[in-house]
Amino acid sequence: MNPLLGFILIILPIALALVLLVYFKKAADTTGVVVWIVTVLIAIFAFQTDIGVAIIASLAGIVRSFPISLMVATSILMMTYMQETGALQRLIVFFKTLGGGSRPMQILIISFGLGLFLVGIGATPVSMLPPVMLALGFSPLVSVALPSIGYDPLTTYALLGVPAQVFTDVYSGVSGSVIDLWFAGSVFASFMPVVSVGIAIAMLWIAGGKKLLFNREGLFIAIIAGVTAGITAIICNLEVVNLTRLTNVIAGAVVLGVLFVYNKVSKKPFMDRAQLDENDLNSEKALSLWRASIPWVILVFLSLLTTLVEPIRNFLANTLDIVINFGQYQTADFTVRSLSISTKFLWQAYTLMLIATLISMPFFKNDRKVLKNTYSKFIKRAPRPVLAAAIFFAMAEVMNFSGFIPDISGVWIFPTDPTNNMVYLLASITSAALGTAYPLTAAFLGLLAGFISGSETSAIAMFTNYHYQASMTIGANSIIVAASNGIGGGLASVLSPAKIQNAAAVIDQIGIEGDVIRYGLVVAVLMTFATALMTLLWAFPLSLYTIGLVFAAIIVVSLIGGIISWMRRPTSQ
């Protein structure tokens, strides 16, 4: 394969996805299917991939997506059921009272602390929080933007740690050495103090511009909230603690606790019921807060039980593990490996989510109408997000096994010409062109993948193998570089058309998505740049050369920012 032609063909599906999303405004699932088809055709006709390999690799990708795709399905089921029983509305009423009337405190309690908790248990801030923010007097743009960026601080641990679990599985597969979930989580956690503080401060800027950004108390509590979340993430992912799956849940609870203590010490109210209207008061009377919280309480309890109690964890994750085998393949060094995917079906977060929903049912009114509406709305809401979550995994596996052909025994053979493998070719070109500066690109590639797919998990699936191979070529720390890609994918949440449209639709503000993305783009790019700098510093042993590269990158970006700011300044009359 000609390197230049191959590079263009590899980039083509990604460019097509951008065009479909941005210009034609196609949904993520439609875009994903089109891009997958194009990738398969390119793999077969340009990279000489066996058609059977392409199809089986796609199926393997879909199975590998189960931790996120099935989690999307079960979380939609739980949220729909809670909505039909009134539990969701009762919780939203409680959320409205938080913050004590202080704008910075409301933002950090609801969009940051509560957002962390909700994302952690599989709830959706973009569906639940926009009406709350609007009721508190924030503009429609801010009411959409804040819950969207609320996905960002610790996205790796969202949905009971699904992205971290997928990273563990994918990285173990491409590297040939099994890593533990807590270890993968600890690598991501090292980025979190900086990322979390940046996101907390960005929330103030989005909500109130310079006025809130330079508000002394607001900036102080934003830093407190961000540092608290980051340090909690590090602690939860220590080997002796091993609570990766509950990192977001615990971090959200700790942030809320710290802000509560701050208000107590400052002698300021933590709650304000003045925001409640008659409908809210009726919701309070109809259902108690503790009953409304039961599905989430059960879910957290099950997560603790299956994570901390070793006999139960081992029985569900290992003894009852269901392994799906798709055959064998040969690596570039002629090692033959099994393409087997360990589903850990009964241990996964999606199973716990389903069980928690079922166990909670006796505590709520379950007449025929509630169950019928839950079923009909679930069938309407779930399929497309599930497909969108799964299809990019299929695309990633096709890229990983492009150029492979089966021998007479059925083993997939690595291409005789290595450039017929998309991942190998892309890794070779970029590592040769950028050298030791290559780690700077990982977070931005993740940002791009996260924007296209709407998911950090999909970004991990798409590019982890590529980053591993490129890092090995230049002698960089591959797990740091690959994790940086995941961080970038998480930061894309504030740019995700699907998430932003969801938030806008909840408050009947479809059409403001472009304005939200423009605000979010500034935050996403700045935080991704900070992540890229940390990646470069940590990818190699510290030296004057890497420090020089970091300073050079800062200077270049500062100059570009200064030029743009100067060009946009108002002209004098």
Indicate where each model-derived feature is located.
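Hydrophobic transmembrane alpha-helices of multi-pass solute/ion transporters
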Residues: 1-77, 90, 94, 98, ...
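Hydrophobic core segments of alpha-helical transmembrane domains in multi-pass membrane transport
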Residues: 10-23, 35-46, 72-79, 115, ...
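Juxtamembrane and boundary regions of transmembrane helices in multi-pass small-molecule transporters
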Residues: 24, 156-276, 487-573
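Alpha-helical transmembrane segments of multi-pass membrane proteins, especially transporters
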Residues: 31-39, 64, 72, 107, ...
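Transmembrane helix-loop junctions in multi-pass membrane proteins
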Residues: 47-55, 87, 120-121, 161-181, ...
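Hydrophobic transmembrane alpha-helices that form the pore/transport pathway of multi-pass ion
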Residues: 96-98, 102-216, 428, 434-437, ...
